[in-house]
């Protein structure tokens, strides 16, 4: 039993990532970030994809440091698919939660 516990403890949890794009159709410059519930800077983010098979919620902000003007994208709207951001303002930061709970 002790061996099985050590074996499962050694298997890392699968990391879920978000890929951001500078073009609405998921083109242009890309950056990859972890879906870790932390605020990430991403100037000119116009679309994103989150790894398939993972619950999440992406909250996009028009201000720096995840402040002001939010758009929310919960699962399953964008699971593994290109999600365009139709925003009138530039998107400067975002938060990708580790589950489907959106930031407020």
Each model region followed by its residue ranges:
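Compact beta-sheet-dominated domain cores in extracellular/mature segments
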Residues: 3-104
């Amino acid at each position: 039993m002790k061996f099985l516990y050590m074996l499962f403890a050694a298997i890392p949890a699968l990391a879920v990532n978000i890929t951001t794009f500078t073009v609405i159709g998921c083109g242009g410059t890309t950056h990859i970030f972890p879906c870790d519930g932390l605020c990430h800077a991403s100037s000119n983010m116009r679309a994103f994809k989150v790894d398939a098979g993972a619950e999440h919620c992406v909250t996009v902000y028009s201000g720096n440091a995840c402040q002001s003007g939010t758009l929310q994208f919960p699962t399953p709207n964008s699971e593994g698919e290109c999600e365009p951001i139709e925003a009138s303002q530039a998107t400067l930061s975002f938060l990708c939660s580790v589950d489907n709970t959106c930031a407020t």
